[in-house]
Design a protein with these regions (language model features):
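Nucleotide-sugar-dependent
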Residues: 242, 298-305, 310-331, 341-350
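N-terminal subdomain of nucleotide-sugar transferases
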Residues: 1-63, 174, 254-256
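A short, well-ordered alpha-helix in the C-terminal region of glycosyltransferases
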Residues: 368, 375, 382-397, 406-409
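Nucleotide-activated donor-binding/catalytic signature segment of Leloir-type glycosyltransferases, i.e.
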Residues: 267, 275-303
Length: 416
């Protein structure tokens, strides 16, 4: 990877994700890397553990270029189910050695770390700090505000996040955060001009239609119900923080007005709230016949589901998690040009207006969410008009090339 002509540095993005398939974190780093490259700056993904699409047997594709993005996996030391072990720590150390070697060989690198658990990733942080390699932690949520850790592993991880919260503002070159709330939070720990707000990113290419094989079960389900029912889509963890209990109650209210509706859900419930528990609640509410769980689906399948949805939901609860973060899926939803109901949390109202580009409901309020659902289906042509406005506004304020350019300028300023 040679140094770009437009700037005199390369950007190494470090994140422990399933690449190129994966969930929100994979989408984050992929679109950022693409945006950086589109701005004529070299970028590379460095990924500790796992392997291409999680296939640990195929070591021949652990380094290469995927959709213009150079990537390199560090998985010499095998691990189990992507969990923290001594071997995964050794993989992290290998990345630290790689960064140090590049610096010794004359590469002028800037490091962005998406994985900010200090216990697990401190070799990378300390290598950058001791060798004066600029590095920018990238935070998309206030991790220490997460719900109380239950397992030993999650308690250890929470300790790592707390250490990062204390140490990284003191030793990093700057911070990249997803919301103004997070900027305000970290401004108590470091100068404001060293904090860049980089919100969700969108790519207009994501609005292009996705096709699945005819024998794909997801496609068969969607095709058999499209135009017969209102397909209302929720994707997430099914937890309180994502407002799922309120969505269920709101959906039940909607069925009195628009009975030919199906709540289509995807995602991975937590082990503390398994799908069996969710289905039990759905059954008790009397909406089981209008509920469909499709499981944890692939990214192209998720895009297909979203593009064929009649309504998409992002109804987070009013919590520290929601207010300091920004739902990445909102950007993906906006690219579908389909109506969206979100709740009034965090920075959403800063960018999108209710009844103009999106439908906004009160958080933790099933009645408010239900009223918005009814509004959408009572005048669906108007709802589609609002959704198209949302698409255009997203391209204006979240475009990945423009926002990546702003981030590059922020980095350049903080290298002076």
């Amino acid at each position: 990877m040679e140094t770009s002509q437009s700037v005199n540095f390369n950007i190494l993005i470090i994140s422990d994700v399933d690449f190129p398939e994966g969930m929100a974190a994979t989408a984050h780093i992929t679109i950022l890397a693409k945006g950086i490259i589109k701005n004529s700056v070299n970028a590379m993904l460095l990924i500790p553990s796992s392997s291409f699409n999680g296939d640990t047997e195929k070591y021949d594709i652990n380094e290469g270029i995927h959709e213009e993005i150079p990537y390199k996996f560090f998985n010499k030391h095998g691990i189990v189910n992507n969990k923290f072990t001594f071997n995964s720590y050794r993989n992290v150390k290998d990345i630290a050695k790689y960064i140090k070697k590049r610096e010794k060989n004359g590469f002028n690198d800037v490091v962005i770390t998406y994985c900010n658990d200090f216990l697990k990733y401190h070799p990378i942080f300390l290598t950058c700090y001791s060798h004066k390699i600029p590095f920018f932690p990238w935070e998309v949520e206030k991790r220490i505000s997460s719900s109380e850790a239950k397992s030993f592993r999650s308690k250890l991880q929470m300790l790592g996040f707390r250490l990062s919260d204390i140490i990284l503002p003191k030793i990093s070159t700057g911070f990249i955060v997803i919301s103004t709330y997070l900027k305000q939070y970290y401004s108590n720990k470091m100068p404001q001009d060293k904090i860049c707000v980089s919100p969700i990113l969108v790519n207009s290419d994501d609005s292009l239609s996705v096709q699945l094989q005819e024998n794909n079960k997801i496609k068969q389900f969607i095709d058999s119900n499209k135009n017969k029912f209102n397909l209302i889509v929720y994707s997430g963890s099914f937890g309180e923080k994502d407002g799922f209990p309120y969505i269920l109650d709101a959906f039940k209210k909607l069925l009195f007005h628009h009975p030919k509706s199906i709540l289509v859900t995807t995602g991975k419930p937590s082990k503390y709230n398994p799908i069996e528990n969710i289905l039990k609640i759905v059954n008790e509410l009397g909406i089981i016949d209008n509920f469909k769980y499709l499981g944890l689906v692939k990214r192209d399948e998720l895009k297909f589901i979203n593009q064929n949805a009649d309504l998409l939901l992002v109804c987070r609860s009013n919590s520290e998690f929601a207010n300091h973060g920004f739902p990445w899926k909102l950007g993906e939803y906006l690219m579908t040009k389909n109506p969206i109901i979100a709740t009034k949390v965090g920075d959403i109202e800063t960018y999108l207006q209710d009844n103009k580009e999106i439908f906004l409901a009160e958080p933790e309020n099933a009645e408010s969410i239900a009223n918005k659902m009814i509004q959408v289906f009572d005048d669906y042509d108007k709802a589609k008009e609002i959704a198209n406005n949302g698409y255009l506004k997203a391209l204006e304020v979240f475009d990945y090339v423009k926002k990546s350019k702003e981030l590059i300028e922020f980095i350049k300023i903080n290298l002076k």
